[in-house]
Amino acid sequence: MTEAVSNFEAPPMSRRVLLNALLSGSVGVVVVGALYPVVKYFIPPSAGGGGEGLIAQDALGKPISVSELLATHAATDRVLAQGLKGDPTYIVIDNGAVANYGLNAVCTHLGCVVPWNVGENLFKCPCHGSQYAANGKVIRGPAPRSLELVSATVDGDNVRFSPWQGPDFRET
């Protein structure tokens, strides 16, 4: 019987070829790592939440009671809650009732959480000084857009957040 014997051998890899391959691989990893956030920035976020929305929760994850909320807060207060996708979201109290909208508390400039300033009746970003009116409309600073709106409805004794549908009433 005849055996087929292959005399093919790979040529030995020189140091130069090995170092070039390692350097190219390293540069490729760095370039891909640097491009990922850039590409992610240009892809719009999904709407999040479901059609039914999400019950607003306090910092401990307990549903917020509307009756308790209105009894313990001023008639024009803004109360921080966990909103859609876990983002900090303000429940807006206007004239002693829960408004039909809430405000995402994340600054549109660089993503800081914007606290409500009761004394000045506005939101002030501690990072770069952006200021927002009581309805979330940007009034000063580097922030490019107003705070994002979410729909807020009273469901029994709870506040339910859902994605905002329709035009921004603050722009009219």
Swiss-Prot record:
Key word Transferase present: no
Q: Which PROSITE patterns match?
A: RIESKE
User: Gene name?
Assistant: petC
Organism expressing this protein natively: Synechococcus sp. (strain JA-2-3B'a(2-13))
Its name, as the record gives it, is Cytochrome b6-f complex iron-sulfur subunit
Where are the disulfide bridges?
A: 112-127
**Residue span of the signal peptide, if any?**
none
User: Any miscellaneous information on file?
Assistant: The Rieske iron-sulfur protein is a high potential 2Fe-2S protein.
Its biological purpose is as follows: Component of the cytochrome b6-f complex, which mediates electron transfer between photosystem II (PSII) and photosystem I (PSI), cyclic electron flow around PSI, and state transitions.
Q: What is its EC number?
A: 7.1.1.6
Q: How does it assemble?
A: The 4 large subunits of the cytochrome b6-f complex are cytochrome b6, subunit IV (17 kDa polypeptide, PetD), cytochrome f and the Rieske protein, while the 4 small subunits are PetG, PetL, PetM and PetN. The complex functions as a dimer.
Where on the tree of life does the source sit, at the highest rank? Bacteria
Note the Gene3D superfamilies from the entry: Rieske [2Fe-2S] iron-sulphur domain, Single helix bin
Cofactor(s) for this UniProt protein: [2Fe-2S] cluster
The entry's family comment says: Belongs to the Rieske iron-sulfur protein family.
Describe how the cofactor binds: Binds 1 [2Fe-2S] cluster per subunit.
Q: Which reaction does it catalyse?
A: 2 oxidized [plastocyanin] + a plastoquinol + 2 H(+)(in) = 2 reduced [plastocyanin] + a plastoquinone + 4 H(+)(out)
Q: Which residues cross the membrane?
A: 19-39
According to the UniProt entry, its GO molecular function terms are: 2 iron, 2 sulfur cluster binding; electron transporter, transferring electrons within cytochrome b6/f complex of photosystem II activity; metal ion binding; monooxygenase activity; oxidoreductase activity, acting on paired donors, with incorporation or reduction of molecular oxygen; plastoquinol--plastocyanin reductase activity
Pfam families xrefs: Rieske (PF00355), TM_PetC (PF25471)
Q: Where does the Rieske domain start and stop, copy by copy?
A: 61-161
